[in-house]
Structure formats: C-alpha cells, structure tokens
Design a protein with these regions (language model features):
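Compositionally biased terminal segments of proteins
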Residues: 1-227
Length: 227
C-alpha cells in the first residue's frame, strides 16, 4: 500500500490506543487496502459506529496520539465528524486526520494497518462523498470502485450511506461537473494527464446511463435536483 510513514505511524498509534469502539480506516486508504486503487493521500480518514459523542471520540483520539508523542490540534467538530491536525514526532510533518460517525452495514476487515471498512461500506461512503461534494478525488475513487460494481450498484451503495435524500439528477450534476475541474485537480492525486480525458468520458458514460434509466422510468433527466 502507498501509505506515507507519518500516516502509518498515526494509524498504528490509534490502533494501539485500544478504544472501546475501534476506529476503522476509511476513505482512499480503505479503497487501497481493498486493492482498488493506489494514489497519493492528502489525509487519513477513520470511521466509527460507536455511540460516544464525536467530541468525546476526538478528545480520546487526541489524548492517545499526544501520549505517543504526536502534537494534535482539533479543528472543526460536528456531531458526525471531527478534523484534527496531527504532527508526526519523527519528521515534524503534519497530517490531516478526519474522524467520521458511520452506520456500517458489514463487519470490519482486518489488515496490517488495523481495522478497515468492509469493501461495500468503503465504496458506499466514497460514493456519498462524490454525491455530496463531487471533488476530483471522489471521481477518481468512484471509477476505481467501478472495477467491482456496476453503475446501479454504486448508486445503491451510496444511497445506503447518504445522510440526505439521494437522487440521481444530483449525482448526474456531480458527474458532468468534472469538466470544470482543472487538470491539476486530478494530477494532484497521481492521475497522469493522458488519463484525464478517459476519466471524464467515463463520468459522462455514467451520466448518460442515469439519463437513459430516468427516461425509462418516466422521469426527466433534466429535472432539478431535490432541494
């Protein structure tokens, strides 16, 4: 796996903390653990379905990392997520650590890096990210997931993890919006320039597939997304 040393140390120290409800690797690292993709990672995502309030989870993780020599600064905090900036004790490099509350559908997988979201949960949360924000990295990861799942399957996995109504016209807008991202948004995550047109064409293919299904179901593919 393409795991930078500071990220690996951070993960090892979180696992060693022995939390009552384990934090599982999520995001791009989880997709990589399942063999879907290998790319640079801007942050570390960890997820839990434990009942503890996120404020308590963030405080517990922060203390555990501080006890092991990391410097920790807590950033934004919501009931479902927390952002921490963690400074590696050996290199002085900083890493962004994102904590998430999730409703998981499958048992965690076990890897050398510790617990990891099951493949379906890892992909579902990534499709939710594509739906919610539509970042270039989300599109890269969604295409990697398409090696294992068809378009309707990806949509269903995303729907299972959605926190708001999940409608196909909104997903379409995220897919077609990839044309507005500069190439640098893709190359920053390891995609070579020659592959970017193929990725955009794949996104258009998915959008067209959604449009065809909406027409078959009697819905207009140009309908405004639900508010």
């Amino acid at each position: 796996m393409n795991v930078p040393a500071p990220h690996a140390r951070l993960l090892a120290d979180v696992v060693a903390a022995g939390l009552s409800h384990p934090l599982a690797l999520a995001g791009g690292h989880a997709l990589e653990a399942h063999g879907l993709i290998e790319r640079p990672h801007a942050n570390v995502d960890l997820a839990t379905e434990g009942p503890e309030p996120m404020e308590e989870v963030a405080a517990t993780v922060g203390r555990a990392l501080t006890d092991r020599g990391h410097e920790v600064a807590v950033g934004s905090l919501t009931p479902l997520s927390a952002q921490l900036t963690v400074t590696d004790p050996e290199t002085g490099e900083t890493s962004e650590l994102s904590l998430h509350k999730e409703a998981l559908r499958h048992p965690l997988a076990v890897t050398d890096l510790g617990p990891v979201l099951a493949l379906e949960d890892a992909v579902g949360t990534k499709i939710r990210a594509l739906y919610d924000r539509g970042a270039a990295v989300d599109l890269i990861d969604a295409r990697a997931a398409a090696a294992r799942f068809g378009f309707p399957e990806l949509e269903e996995l995303g729907r299972r993890h959605a926190r708001d109504p999940f409608d196909l016209p909104t997903l379409q807008s995220r897919l077609t919006g990839s044309d507005y991202y500069p190439d640098s948004a893709f190359t920053a995550y390891g995609l070579d320039a020659a592959s970017i047109p193929d990725l955009r064409a794949w996104a258009q293919e998915w959008s067209d597939d959604i449009a065809e299904r909406l027409l078959e179901e009697g819905a207009s593919p140009d309908a405004d997304p639900e508010p």
